[in-house]
From Swiss-Prot:
PANTHER family for the chain: RABCONNECTIN-3B, ISOFORM A (PTHR44099), WD REPEAT-CONTAINING PROTEIN 7 (PTHR44099:SF3)
Designated name of the protein: WD repeat-containing protein 7
WD repeat residue numbers: 17-56, 62-104, 156-199, 324-366, 404-443, 462-507, 558-597, 1349-1388, 1390-1430
Source species: Rattus norvegicus (Rat)
A Pfam family assignment: WD40
GO biological process, one term: hematopoietic progenitor cell differentiation
A GO CC term attached to the entry: synaptic vesicle
Presence of the UniProt keyword Repeat in the record: yes
Length: 1488
């Protein structure tokens, strides 16, 4: 899901902070961020300021088990990467700056500790992660790809490692890994950079193994201050050893029988040790432990009792501890170069962080004086101090009298088909509410703030206490009735509700415990089971409840342990239940009999066998994060099933579309633009709601609705009558019966509307009765357009309104803000919106409320001062100053949506349902469609390649549409103003943000993320990405571009130098780039990428290419190669052409702009970069399709686009013929592909490739017309020669050339239109191409003027119909004569300079030719004897020059290029008389 569609989460946290029971802590190297992992699998990022103030910034989701350890994973200053490991073997590499998951993997072992180790190979620095845990070795893992490279193994008594430390040696190249096993044996391995550079080497055995008798070791630390001592902390004592020979230097017992849990060196002579109840002690070491002192090692060999150093300082007083569930986690960190604090950080089970700043404590302090905490904050504290409080999704409807806490939402389900969110609450009530409306109330300011109980909603009451789970079965499978909603509660009951009428249909009371889960059986179960839902309860029972029969058909109880997982075996009619103790029970569904129970390996095999039978039905009950992750990765499946019925299906559209043809073709697109997912960090927490906005789906829905909008006005009966008689398309459909049905529907909508406004709070009795009556009459119900419409509103426009209002950078441009509020109808946010960021594999980071508070106390003061007005000071600017990845996603979204709305007719969000005035203009697209709509924009508007800046063409089009009506002008004016507003919005975000925000705050978009979307499948997103990338490349100027090139050039794959040329056969090409099979890690990668559609840019898995570097199968490596090709291609194409391109292409570029390596003739410059980029692009274009590089992958399309854009730069290094043939091959069927595209929907990959290839051909032809013409002419000659020599085998290009005739003619036509001078220079070659592409029979039948009128514009081309001959004058003074019947061509020479005009006499006997350069007009006699005309013996017609006249030369009107082409023309007035007509009207008459 995150792979290629642009999906942005927005979170509504609610007032209660998520549970965060801390299990591990890390401070990043720059000292700016604390990372904490918790027992529920989330990771929290906390900002730490220089004054040691802490503010929680984001929560990272992705792990499905408790976090066991965290470690840094990168040593370079600009990147802050952290690696996390969880109890079930998952490892993730995170970018701490923005919470992106860079890489993830899952091993079959649990790590309990990870250490980062960096070494240099040559001038490259590589990182490794040394992991230890519940396995008897140390694994060495690559820090960027997370691949296991090799392991450190014990020969002598191998055992689990309990703690480990890396000792860096500055003197030698060898580093030492010291580890202590669980049994107290010290192990030493030597790691050299040579070993580390290798991959998959043999395991490395230990150098030394020595028992030091330290049981239950908690931590092992090396003294960085002296480089000589080791501190080992065990649960009952701690010891200091000499790192040279591991002899004991001193020892300390535990205080008051407490258990030590860790320790570290504070300075050369002090250690800090902490206990499991959170107390810490600082000890001063005796002189015998200090290498600098004379008495160093003086105590070696003494009995342990004699070595106790005194306590120097107790850190934390016991009295201010609060009760915690489990022991707190304590870690000591001391800063690196620029960051000198020494900090002790402690995290506990309530999500509280405590920090002590341990400066070098002066010796004079008393031993009993406790050091106070510097900072102490919990997640809940951070939530509580925010004003306004963080909002929950339905807080305004959950107010409890006399309490400031709203009712908690305990279960939720979203129904995308109706845009409704169903929330179960802790008091047992269930609320059904429009999701976008309630989110608007929580996030944005507007009139809704004045309304109590807005938006209109429905309350279902039936459970006596907390609702624990909700299920809408129709969403999972269409076999269920769409009225049914199922809920389970702590009152042991399961209730079936009718969501349309709000009544309770049935209550099941079959369980003896609270309901923990509701599931849907898979499709292929028996007919009876298919209408059941499966309920799981805390009394360890499972029930199958039939919705049809309203009874429980099977109850599987008697399980001894809680139920962990439910699996299905439909073919054998088995329900398989897995319990927490590892046992499995197999039940027969029809009879309810227990078939068998199994334990151990048998149980595992039974569960795995079920997976094979029903792969999709993996329902883990254990952990909320698992469900979230599955929901995310499988979202496309769910979305396919619950495809929201578009507004297309509503009201008038169905009636106005011509029934037979259109109705079947109305496009159904599989994604929903909004998904609401409830997540819990812990089972006891209330729901947090995440709104996922799918930008591409939203754009498609907007465009589809725009395209489907009928042209008929449906305001009142009068208008209906008028419409049926009007010339409006679609009006004629509205005859008798149709109009009656339409009325009925309009009335329904109005009734529905009025009714729902009465239903603001609780329903009246009679209202309910009436509803029941309606329900009982099935015909009546069937005629309703949309039963759940609680209030009339356009879901798509509302989603866009909510989304755009949250994304816009408010407060930077007051004029534009006014336009947004008044003209476009956007709303300002109450407070900073918490966005999220999705990354690979369903991992996501969600910003916590108040993430931007860490700017310090200034903002606080400002906010206090401005409390009287709305506190929107820092509201909007937030997201563009957070991180580069967030900026990229948000800019792409807002620009692509603004452009989409701009291309629509009057797309404003004003005209809300709040205003109930009778004259209000309806919202565009609401069912009453009361405004005459404009026709949808012409598809060429969608297809144009540049960012849509001006709204003018749109308004011009609508003006034409409205020409009949007088009242159109005000509507037109508003339409124009709205489009202008969207245009300004897009322009501001595209280019003006850096200046408005200031470069200090602005986080520029990531070039690589934009590059990956250079050819996004959604055209609007694609255009936004291209505009943003080019704007950013211009902004960073030459120095920045140079830096970008230097960064990415190393990733450019090195392809073979011989690019495939036309002579090479397909088989040779196959062998040349034979790709290794996708086996081993490659296969694994492909498996786990199931959430990436084939549209992801890495699908050109370039790792199949021979490279200089080691072959890496890491996803990130492949992605970097793809990105490097795109980025270098874009920079080369846009900024690399030294030669001034033709004026038509783009603005001229001055030579100073050329990035190093892309210039053509810059004196001896290194132009190998252009060559390598060009090789990569041509390789991607010409590489035959394979599983690794599908025929229409994104990366291939990107290569096509960039070859076209930068042809002038690449031309010297490419085989032009092969490239043009490759492009022609792709667009040979373009007409067919592009004919059946649906307005608004993304193009199919094949059509998209064809469209890109077409565009590239046009760009290449207009950039270098001679290259294009000569290459194609050469191919034509080769082809005709081959065709003549029938024995020769078919060339591989034959079919391409033949199939692409139409495409070649299209390009030639563009050239004649735009570059006539270039065409005339090569007119004979052009004519050769045209003669090849046109069907001879067609020309004979219709004549050249009709078949290809463009070429007949030239005075030096003449066609004689009766003998079917064409004469073409060439630049070098010869004339080519084509005979269409024989396909032969003959050349005559008679002039010294270019031919200005040629013309056949009316009877075809004479040909007049004129050249202005040598000022001669010649007459040629055509041999038209009977034999000649039959073409006897295939002889060429005899031609002889019978007369030549001298003519005064004609002067061109001005030195412009086109004038030279139209100097003079020849006009025959009779069979023997001809006039030479000059451009200025002078005539010369001649007679033959």
């Amino acid at each position: 899901m995150a792979g290629n569609s642009l999906v942005l989460p927005i979170v509504l946290w609610g007032r209660k902070a998520p549970t965060h029971c801390i299990s591990s802590i890390l401070l990043t190297d720059d000292g700016g961020t604390i990372v904490t992992g918790c027992h529920d699998g989330q990771i929290c990022l906390w900002d730490l300021s220089e004054e040691l103030e802490v503010n929680p910034r984001a929560l990272l989701f992705g792990h499905t088990a408790a976090i066991t350890c965290l470690s840094k994973a990168c040593a370079s200053g600009d990147k802050q990467y952290t690696v996390s490991a969880s109890a079930n073997g998952e490892m993730c590499l995170w970018d701490v700056n923005d919470g992106r998951c860079i890489e993830f993997t899952k091993l079959a072992c649990t790590h309990t500790g990870i250490q980062f180790y960096q070494f240099s190979v040559g001038n490259q620095r590589e990182g490794r992660l040394l992991c230890h845990g519940h396995y008897p070795e140390i694994l060495v893992v690559d820090a960027t790809s997370l691949e296991v490279l090799y392991s450190l193994v014990s020969k002598i008594s191998p055992d689990w490692i309990s703690s480990m430390s890396i000792i860096r040696s500055h003197r030698t190249q060898e580093d030492t890994v010291v580890a202590l096993s669980v049994t107290g044996i010290l192990k030493v391995w030597i790691v050299t950079s040579e070993i580390s550079g290798l991959q998959d080497t043999e395991p490395i055995f230990e150098e030394e193994s020595k028992p030091i008798y330290c049981q239950n070791c908690q931590s092992l630390s090396f003294c960085a201050f002296t480089q000589r001592s080791l501190l080992v902390v065990c649960s009952k004592y701690w010891r200091v050893f000499d790192a040279g020979d591991y002899s004991l230097l001193c020892s300390g017992p535990s205080e008051d029988g407490q258990t030590w849990t860790g320790g570290d060196f504070v300075s050369a002579d002090k250690v800090i040790i902490w206990t499991e109840n959170g107390q810490s002690y600082i000890y001063k070491l005796p002189a015998s432990c200090l290498p600098a002192s004379d008495s160093f090692r003086s105590d070696v060999g003494k009995a342990v009792e004699n070595l106790i150093p005194p306590v120097q300082h107790s850190l934390l007083d016991q009295k201010d501890r609060e009760l915690v569930i489990c022991p707190p986690v304590t870690r000591f960190f001391y800063g690196c170069k620029e960051y000198l604090h020494k900090l002790l950080i402690q995290g506990d089970s309530s999500g509280r962080l405590s920090i002590w700043n341990i400066a070098d404590i002066a010796d004079k302090q008393e031993a009993n004086e406790g050091l106070k905490t510097t900072t102490c904050i919990s997640l809940q504290d951070a939530f509580d101090k925010l004003k306004p409080c963080p909002a929950g999704i339905i807080d305004q409807l959950s107010v409890i009298p006399n309490s400031n806490e709203p009712l908690k939402v305990t279960a939720s389900v979203y129904i995308p088909a109706h845009g409704r969110l169903v929330c179960g609450r802790e008091d047992g009530s269930i609320i059904i509410v429009p999701a976008t409306q309630t989110a608007i109330v929580q996030l944005l300011q507007g009139e809704h703030m004045l309304r109590r109980g807005w938006p209109p909603h429905r309350t279902l009451r039936g459970h006596r206490n907390k609702v624990t789970c909700l299920l809408y079965p129709h969403q999972v499978s269409a076999r269920y009735d769409q009225r049914y909603l199922i809920s389970g509660g702590v009152d042991f009951s399961v209730i079936i509700w009718d969501i349309f009428s709000g009544e309770m249909k049935h209550i099941f009371c079959v369980h003896g415990g609270e309901i923990t889960q509701l599931l849907v059986p898979p499709e292929n179960c028996s007919a009876r089971v298919q209408h059941c839902v499966c309920s799981v309860a805390s009394d360890h029972s499972v029930g199958l409840l039939s919705l049809r029969e309203k009874k429980c058909i099977m109850l599987a109880s008697r399980h001894l342990f809680p139920i962990q997982v439910i699996k299905w075996r439909p073919s054998d009619d088995y329900l398989v239940v897995g319990c927490t103790d590892g046992s499995v029970c197999v039940w027969q569904m029809d009879t309810g009999a227990l078939d068998r129970c199994a334990m151990g390996i048998t149980a595992v095999e039974i569960l795995n066998a079920c997976d094979e039978a029903v792969p999709a039905a993996v329902d883990s009950l254990s952990h909320p994060a698992v469900n979230l992750k599955q929901a995310m990765t499988r979202r496309s499946l769910a979305a396919l099933k619950n495809m929201a019925h578009h507004k297309l299906q509503t009201l008038a559209t169905n009636l106005l579309a011509s029934e037979a043809s259109d109705k079947g073709n109305l496009p159904k697109y599989s994604h929903n633009s909004l998904m609401v997912q409830a997540i819990k960090t812990n089972l006891t927490d209330p729901d947090i709601h995440v709104l996922f906005f799918d930008v591409e789906a939203l754009i498609i829905q907007l465009l589809t609705e725009e395209a489907s909008r009928p042209n008929t006005a449906l305001i009142s009966p009068e208008n209906l009558q008028k419409a049926s008689g009007s010339s409006d398309k679609g009006g004629s459909f509205l005859t008798g019966k149709r109009a009656a049905v339409l009325f009925q529907q309009v009335k329904e909508t109005i009734k529905e509307n009025i009714k729902e406004h009465l239903l603001d709070e609780e329903e009246d009795e009679e209202e309910v009765m009436r509803q029941r009556r309606e329900e009982s009459d099935p015909e009546y119900r069937a005629s309703k357009s949309k039963p759940l419409t609680l209030l009339e509103y356009n879901l798509t426009m509302d989603t866009a309104k909510l989304f755009m209002s949250c994304l816009h950078a408010w407060g930077l441009n007051e004029v534009l803000d006014e336009v947004c509020l008044d003209r476009l109808g956007m709303l300002k946010p109450h407070c900073t919106v918490s966005f999220g960021l999705l990354s690979r594999g369903g991992h996501m980071s969600l910003m916590l409320p108040g993430y931007n508070q860490a700017a310090g106390k200034l903002l606080q003061a400002k906010a206090e001062a401005g409390r009287k007005g709305p506190a929107t000071e820092s509201v909007g600017k937030g997201t563009y100053t957070v991180s580069r990845a967030v900026t990229t996603q948000h800019l792409l979204s807002i620009i692509s949506l603004a452009n989409t709305l701009m291309s629509m007719t009057n797309a404003t969000f004003i005209g809300d349902h709040m205003k109930k005035g009778p004259t209000r203009p309806p919202r565009p697209g609401t069912p009453d469609l009361s405004k005459a709509r404009d026709s949808p924009p012409a598809s060429s508007n969608i297809v144009q390649g540049q960012i849509k800046q001006a709204a003018a063409p749109v308004s011009a089009r609508s003006a034409a549409d409205h020409s009949g009506s007088a009242s159109a002008s005000p509507a037109l004016r508003t339409c124009f103003l709205v489009n202008e507003g969207w245009s300004q919005l897009a322009a501001m975000h595209c280019v003006m943000l850096p200046d408005l925000l200031g470069l200090g705050k602005f986080r520029p978009p990531l070039l690589e993320m934009l590059a990956r979307r250079w050819q996004d499948r959604c055209l609007e997103v694609r255009e936004a990405a291209q505009a943003l990338l080019l704007a950013e490349l211009r902004r960073i100027e030459q120095a920045g571009r140079k830096e970008t090139i230097d960064t990415w050039a190393p990733y450019l794959p090195q392809y073979m130098d011989h690019v495939i040329s036309p002579g090479v056969t397909a088989e040779a090409m196959q062998t040349m780039a034979a790709a290794p099979d996708a086996s081993g890690p490659e296969a694994k990668v492909q498996e786990e990428e199931h959430d990436l559609v084939d549209d992801d840019i890495t699908t050109g898995c370039l790792s199949s290419v021979p490279q200089m570097k080691k072959m890496s199968t890491s996803y990130e490596e492949r992605r970097k190669q793809a990105t490097a090709i795109v980025l270098l291609g874009v920079i080369g194409a846009e900024f690399g052409a030294e030669i001034e391109p033709p004026k038509l292409l783009t603005r001229p570029r001055s030579s100073s702009q050329i990035p190093e390596g892309f210039g053509l003739t810059s004196g001896g410059s290194n132009y190998s970069l252009a060559r390598h980029t060009c090789k990569a692009l041509t390789f991607l274009l010409l590489q035959p399709p394979s599983p690794k590089l599908p025929p229409h992958s994104t990366i291939r399309r990107t290569a096509i686009d960039l070859i076209g854009r930068g042809f002038t730069v690449w031309e010297p290094y490419m085989d032009v013929s092969a490239v043009l043939m490759g492009l022609l091959e792709l667009c040979a069927d373009a007409e067919k592909q592009l004919a059946n595209i649906t307005m608004g929907l993304p193009l199919s990959p094949a059509a998209d490739s064809a469209r890109s290839a077409r565009h590239a051909l046009s760009l290449i032809a207009t950039a270098r017309p001679p290259a294009f013409i000569t290459t194609i002419a050469k191919e034509v000659h080769r082809h005709t020669a081959l065709a003549a020599n029938t024995q020769s085998q078919q060339s591989i290009h034959t079919t391409t050339l033949a199939r692409a005739k139409g495409e070649i003619l299209r390009v030639i036509e563009i050239l004649i239109e735009k570059m006539p001078t270039d065409v005339v220079d090569l007119l004979v070659e052009v004519m050769d191409i045209i003669m090849y592409c046109l069907e001879g029979s067609l020309v004979k039948k219709k004549g050249l003027q009709e078949c290809f009128p463009a070429i007949c514009r030239f005075y030096m081309v003449s066609y004689y119909e009766r003998s079917h001959r064409i004469a073409v004058g060439a630049r070098h003074g010869s004339v080519a004569l084509y005979d269409i019947r024989t396909g032969k061509c003959q050349t005559i020479h008679g002039h010294k300079g270019p031919i200005t005009a040629v013309s056949f006499a009316p009877d075809g006997r004479y040909l007049a030719t004129y050249s202005n350069t040598d000022s001669h007009i010649s007459f040629w006699q055509m041999n038209t004897s009977l034999l000649g005309s039959i073409g006897m013996l295939n002889s060429a017609p005899q031609l002889r020059c019978i007369k030549t006249y001298q003519v005064p030369p004609v002067q061109p009107a001005s030195p412009g290029s086109h004038n030279a082409l139209r100097l003079a023309r020849l006009i025959w007035t009779s069979n023997r008389n001809v006039i030479l007509m000059a451009h200025d009207g002078k005539e010369h008459r001649f007679m033959v």
